[in-house]
């Protein structure tokens, strides 16, 4: 039932905590509450929650759920695995014919939103500062490296020009039935607003 939450929470009109250190519940959060109750009452969702076993099973061969709100990283790292009838760890292959691999596709949602990201942190006091710097710069700033990450993992990486190049190329995802989902992400990403993020989001969301 909570898949759609980030569409609302990422499009609020103000941060969670105001200048007086007072928690403010945005109208958009209450719209999500109202919609969730309505959809639950009408049976539009399966009453499961993110990451629980029912939610995961609903994404597989026996699932009856029409669709899911997801992150870019979740497509390959979570949805793909859940789609397989025989998991890779049990000898299954990531290929058409194993469960519903190849049956999914990505479509544009009602609003652009983000769901976390992939982070890299360095330890304070490291005696390998230059090496750490090179690793971080390569993974986060080197266009060729980031394009390769996208091509290998299907995730959306931190290079606008690189993602636009992949979007206009013949790149395709076998898991997504041959779709170039990066083309859709490249269109949606510029519409994401980060102006109301705060240090309280992780706890309050």
Name every feature range the model reports, one short phrase each.
Residues 18-50, 93-106:
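Glycine-centered hinge/linker elements that transmit conformational signals in sensory
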Residues 3, 27-35, 55, 64, ...:
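Extracytoplasmic/secreted proteins, especially bacterial periplasmic and envelope-associated proteins
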Residues 1-22, 37, 63-67:
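Extracytoplasmic/periplasmic solute-binding protein
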Residues 41-44, 62-67, 100-104, 128-134, ...:
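Loop/turn elements at helix/coil->beta-strand transitions in domains of secreted/extracellular proteins
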Residues 52-68:
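Short helices/loops that flank or line small-molecule/ion binding pockets
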């Amino acid at each position: 039932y909570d898949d759609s939450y980030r569409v609302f929470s990422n499009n609020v009109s103000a941060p969670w905590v105001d200048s007086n250190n007072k928690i403010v519940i945005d109208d958009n959060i209450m719209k999500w509450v109202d919609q969730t109750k309505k959809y639950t009452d009408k049976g539009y969702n399966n009453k499961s929650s993110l990451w629980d076993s029912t939610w995961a099973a609903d994404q597989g061969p026996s699932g009856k759920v029409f669709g899911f709100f997801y992150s870019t990283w979740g497509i390959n790292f979570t949805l793909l695995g859940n789609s397989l009838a025989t998991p890779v760890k049990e000898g299954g292959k990531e290929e058409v014919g194993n469960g519903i691999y190849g049956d999914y596709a990505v479509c544009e949602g009602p609003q652009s939103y983000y769901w976390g990201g992939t982070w890299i942190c360095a330890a304070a006091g490291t005696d390998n500062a230059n090496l750490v710097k090179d690793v971080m710069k390569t993974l986060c700033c080197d266009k060729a490296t980031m394009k390769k990450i996208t091509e290998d993992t299907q995730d959306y990486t931190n290079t606008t020009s690189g993602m636009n190049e992949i979007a206009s190329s013949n790149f395709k995802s076998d898991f997504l039935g041959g779709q170039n989902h990066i083309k859709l992400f490249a269109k949606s990403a510029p519409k994401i607003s980060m102006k109301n993020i705060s240090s309280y989001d992780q706890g309050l969301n």
